[in-house]
Swiss-Prot record, chains A, B:
UniProt keyword annotations, A-Z: Hydrolase, Magnesium, Metal-binding, Nucleotide metabolism, Nucleotide-binding
Binding site for Mg(2+): 39, 69
UniProt organism field: Ignicoccus hospitalis (strain KIN4/I / DSM 18386 / JCM 14125)
GO-annotated biological processes: nucleotide metabolic process; purine nucleoside triphosphate catabolic process
Protein name (record): dITP/XTP pyrophosphatase
InterPro entries assigned: dITP/XTP_pyrophosphatase, ITPase-like_fam, RdgB/HAM1
GO molecular function: dITP diphosphatase activity; ITP diphosphatase activity; metal ion binding; nucleotide binding; ribonucleoside triphosphate phosphatase activity; XTP diphosphatase activity
Length: 188, 188
């Protein structure tokens, strides 16, 4: 099978690794493109990813160009921290989120990833992947990054940070979004 | 004294009223310009206001054009909620912020406002106003908006929501930023 090359705009090496793990299963080679994407304030990761893709396509000439935005949406907190998950992780941390969930019985949450593809013809495709789960009562595990140590995906008893890449590359929000993107790339 | 007219881009009627209260003291008339400003994700309100002003000056022809971005920065929470104060107010609310501060002795916080002025010659001026204070232990008062009911400015025992506009128009972050802006407008 001929391998295809795509560029992935990110400043997060964890994300580059995860996207590469997913796309390599489709014989797609991921070339990290170091740089900042422009992120707007919006209530959905789709909106953030779409705006970032529109802006990045003017600034970068590499094609196909990928980027993504993702977040943890906690039902009992009206979706918080949502698209601001990175900022909230850096300020409140896992402890802050767990404090907000103290005494809260409804632990349901979902990770959502919006992946954006800027195609050779400059058209933009957005695909969204989600994984449902629950917020744990304490951090567990040391794999992954961000809120992984307190997220238990539906059907599992371990957190993403305990399960690690073998499971994440099959069921994570990012895996699900980029598997859909892989179909667009193979079809090009 | 000749009154001068300025346009203020906002979707928040409370902010329009507060800015008008401040600038009317300088014989400056504020005309609200209804519309959304484009807000980026950034760790400071200055960055958010500057980007919004650069974008707004392309989209609106009215001059002088004002806009602002503001936020509540809590020391013990590494500045959270900062530039995302509106989102955090809509999701976690006052209760969520108070829950994060449970058992926290260091209550210090500051409201920061970055006011942007797009002048007749399209040059942009940014002025920042701050007010120091503390996070209260429970909400008090029904004036103002946002986090006003849990913010006690330094030198006072009441919250902004108890003190109301007579005090806010003299000492608030927004008042302080727009008093500096008034000097630019009078000097034009």
């Amino acid at each position: 099978m001929v391998s295809k090359k795509v560029y992935f705009l990110t400043s997060n090496p964890h994300k580059a690794k995860e996207v590469s793990d997913v796309l390599s299963q489709f014989s797609i080679e991921v070339v990290p493109l170091k740089g900042e994407k422009l992120e707007i304030q919006a209530d959905s990761v789709e909106e953030v990813a779409r705006f970032a893709a529109e802006e990045a396509k003017k600034r970068f000439k590499e094609r196909p160009l990928l980027l993504e935005d993702s977040g943890l949406f906690v039902d009992a907190l009206k979706g918080f921290p949502g698209p601001y998950s990175n900022y909230v992780y850096r300020t409140l941390g896992l402890e802050g989120l767990l404090k907000l969930m103290e005494g809260v019985e409804d632990r349901r949450a979902r990770f959502v990833c919006a992946a954006a593809l800027v195609k050779e013809d400059d058209k933009i495709v957005i695909e969204v992947g989600e994984v449902e789960g629950e917020i744990a009562y304490e951090p567990r595990g040391d794999k992954g990054f961000g809120f992984d140590p307190i997220f238990v995906p539906l059907g599992y008893e371990k957190t993403f940070a305990e399960l690690g890449e073998e499971v994440k590359k099959r069921i994570s929000h990012r895996a699900r979004a980029f598997m859909k993107i892989a179909k667009h790339l193979s079809g090009e």
